[in-house]
Amino acid sequence: MTNEFHHVTVLLHEAVDMLDIKPDGIYVDATLGGSGHSAYLLSLLGDKGHLYCFDQDQKAIDHAQEQLKPYIDKGQVTFIKDNFRHLKARLLEHGVTEIDGILYDLGVSSPQLDERERGFSYKQDAPLDMRMDSQAALTAYEVVNTYDFNDLVRIFFKYGEDKFSKQIARKIEQARAIKPISTTTELAALIKSAKPAKELKKKGHPAKQIFQAIRIEVNDELGAADASIQRAIELLALDGRISVITFHSLEDRLTKHLFKEASTADAPKGLPFIPDELKPKLELVSRKPILPSQKELMANNRAHSAKLRVARKVRK
């Protein structure tokens, strides 16, 4: 399993160290993935500390159960197989009403990208799937073959920010009228054919943004992140911290907006003083996002777009 689930953790020390770990604290890894952040966080906990790990991918949990066995044996880890949008409800089931810190590593993990049959990558021929939870109902196949023209344009533009969204949606509509589009390479070729020649000369794969858009739609990634981060802020104890790693502008803008909203006083301008109940709930630990070091960028190409934002709870 270890070899099958190889994952290089991004911003490992930065994301965990910025949580200011208390040895006896209660922490959450909202995106277990390859368990790199969890392993490092657990190494900083004392015997009374506990970590709750969320992932909707059973393979990630199976891998972590091998990697984190010493901590499991000591009763310091609880795995929860669910979408992190249900974070608060699932933690309440375990009697957890307050946490000292939480970490998010948003986006797709390397094993999911690299596992051909998951259909996340435009670089490998595979069935159109893209589900992070293999038990979920909606697949990329259904999005590509059943969404109408306007809905395709909407998700391509909104989640992929691709200026050729209409042309690509039209190509898909024409192709699927003849036969269903069933593989990643079929879809990638259609996307490429919809773009002008000068666009194809630009750096990066022409299908990258559209694949991202479909993946976000299939997994409702932004909706889940929005709901989860808001619940996480509610759960944080005073002085508790939240670390969020993002990999594209949509995730980063969402995180920045949620942090700004919670770190701004909810009071009209001009008041002589701000009542306690209207004071900000969060304080930004770093005003600008923390970026990977040059050393990390050289060692891990997937770290290039990573950004880390951190905030601290200052009011319940």
Curated annotation (Swiss-Prot):
InterPro entries: RsmH, SAM-dep_MeTrfase_MraW_recog, SAM-dependent_MTases_sf. It is an enzyme of class 2 (transferase). It comes from the Bacteria. GO terms for molecular function: rRNA (cytosine-N4-)-methyltransferase activity. It holds the Pfam family Methyltransf_5. It is found in: Cytoplasm. GO terms for cellular component: cytoplasm. Its main location: cytoplasm. GO terms for biological process: rRNA base methylation. The keyword Methyltransferase applies. S-adenosyl-L-methionine binds at residues 35-37, 55, 84, 105, 112. Its EC number is 2.1.1.199. Transmembrane segments: none annotated. It catalyses: cytidine(1402) in 16S rRNA + S-adenosyl-L-methionine = N(4)-methylcytidine(1402) in 16S rRNA + S-adenosyl-L-homocysteine + H(+). Keywords: Cytoplasm, Methyltransferase, rRNA processing, S-adenosyl-L-methionine, Transferase. Belongs to the methyltransferase superfamily. RsmH family. Specifically methylates the N4 position of cytidine in position 1402 (C1402) of 16S rRNA. This is Ribosomal RNA small subunit methyltransferase H. It comes from Streptococcus equi subsp. equi (strain 4047). The lineage of its organism: Bacteria, Bacillati, Bacillota, Bacilli, Lactobacillales.
